[in-house]
Amino acid sequence: MEKINYLLPEESAEMTLNQVKSLRQIEGRLRKLFSLKNYQEVMPPSFEYTQLYTALESNGKTFNQEKMFQFIKHEGQSITLRYDFTLPLVRLYSQIKDSTSARYSYFGKIFRKEKRHKGRSTENYQIGIELFGESADKSELEILSLALQVIEQLGLNKTVFEIGSAKFFQRLCQLADGSTELLTELLLKKDLSGLNAFIEKNNFSKELRGLLKEIFITNELSRLENLVTNTKDDVLISSFDQLKEFSEKLSMIKPIIIDLGMVPKMDYYTDLMFKAYSSAANQPILSGGRYDQLLSNFQEEAFAIGFCCHMDTILKALERQELEEDND
């Protein structure tokens, strides 16, 4: 009898036995940590009405419908396989809110269509938390502190933690006067030569030119502060001051890098953003931020902030780290 070779779709991801073991160990540690911090574990449904994603707008943009796995129910309504965890938890908070604040944790997969040639998987395992309804200062410090504690539980040796501001980025785009798309691309790629060419082609003020030319500096805080202060722009200055305050308050836990060129990964981020990286990975291992505007779509007004661990990236980084240690 001929043996049939059943292949996985190229976009699918199948964890190895060691990856599953590592995942469950990390889950156990993080469940314990989240429980100690009073975060309740929730399990959103795998499917949501597509309208949950397409009807919500943030900063004039909608979610990328081309990346959604959509299906038609027998009644004719469109439903979508879970695209992310944040929106379902915003919906949950708005529906069952019985207090001024809520703390949720989650463990599971999200599903997004990806192009084959990019080598990305359409299914990604995430572990994360969301905090709703606390005051801005309290919630931001709580989440940042918890994110740093989570990083310590991952088992990765060399990590860095960066913070940025969506408000700072949005103000830069306003000052760029119609060149938002190009500026965003240059900042995402951290293309210094391209950024210098962009600056020369535009009639920016001397102070803004000075800031943009050195915006990728991350190890000279006083120099960055002077460059921002010289712009005399209230939004840029207040955003930087907030990041500096977070850096100073959390530096006893772990050194914090301020990245003024950080670009929001999700359109709904409104203020603080942060990412963590490992020397054993080429993608962020953790990312998060503030997204207050999303709640207004559910007739709620409250501060909202959260983050997620990108477990597929983390598990591969752990394997690479172990391999490097064995070769030393």
Curated annotation (Swiss-Prot):
Gene name for this UniProt entry:
hisZ
Superkingdom of origin organism:
Bacteria
Asked whether the keyword Coiled coil is assigned, the reply is: no
| HAMAP family to which the protein is assigned, alphabetical | HisZ
The protein's name is ATP phosphoribosyltransferase regulatory subunit
Instruction: Note the subunit structure.
Output: Heterooctamer composed of four HisG and four HisZ subunits.
Question: What is stated as this protein's family in its record?
Answer: Belongs to the class-II aminoacyl-tRNA synthetase family. HisZ subfamily.
What function does the entry list? Required for the first step of histidine biosynthesis. May allow the feedback regulation of ATP phosphoribosyltransferase activity by histidine.
Can you say where in the cell this protein is located?
Cytoplasm
Q: In which pathway does it act?
A: Amino-acid biosynthesis; L-histidine biosynthesis; L-histidine from 5-phospho-alpha-D-ribose 1-diphosphate: step 1/9
Q: Which GO terms describe its cellular component?
A: cytoplasm
The record's Gene Ontology biological-process terms are:
histidyl-tRNA aminoacylation; L-histidine biosynthetic process
Task: Please spell out the taxonomic lineage of the organism that makes this protein.
Answer: Bacteria, Bacillati, Bacillota, Bacilli, Lactobacillales
What Pfam families does the entry give? tRNA-synt_His
The record makes one more remark, namely: This function is generally fulfilled by the C-terminal part of HisG, which is missing in some bacteria such as this one.
List, alphabetically, the CDD domains matched.
HisRS-like_core
**Keywords in alphabetical order:** Amino-acid biosynthesis, Cytoplasm, Histidine biosynthesis
Quick check: keyword Cytoplasm in the entry? yes
| InterPro entries in the record | aa-tRNA-synth_II, aa-tRNA-synth_II/BPL/LPL, HisRS-like_core, HisRS/HisZ, HisZ
Q: Name one GO molecular function term.
A: histidine-tRNA ligase activity
